[in-house]
Amino acid sequence: MLELNLQLFAHKKGGGSTSNGRDSQAKRLGAKASDGELVSGGSILFRQRGTHIHPGTNVGRGGDHTLFAKIEGTVKFEMKRGKKHVSVYPVVAK
């Protein structure tokens, strides 16, 4: 008896999707120090795009809007005039 072994193959290779398969690296934005935390001068407090949080007392703002401590002290997140601010207050010696 004659047996047929019929196999069908693709005549074109499967094309990969070119619109998918890419994603950007996470930028690690957000708070780097929490409220009440003791930080040293130059420590990064908050990384952001734009001014979501504004610099308060003893806090500077970098070129990319990163907030950093100017002095050693305690971090305090607070509202001033309806906007969020982060400040660093020096530790009071007892």
Curated annotation (Swiss-Prot):
GO terms for molecular function: structural constituent of ribosome. InterPro entries: Ribosomal_bL27, Ribosomal_bL27_CS. PROSITE patterns: RIBOSOMAL_L27. GO terms for cellular component: cytosolic large ribosomal subunit. Residues 1-9 form a propeptide. Residues 12-33 are annotated as: Disordered. It comes from the Bacteria. The N-terminus is cleaved by ribosomal processing cysteine protease Prp. Keywords: Ribonucleoprotein, Ribosomal protein. GO terms for biological process: translation. Belongs to the bacterial ribosomal protein bL27 family. This is Large ribosomal subunit protein bL27. It comes from Lactococcus lactis subsp. lactis (strain IL1403) (Streptococcus lactis).
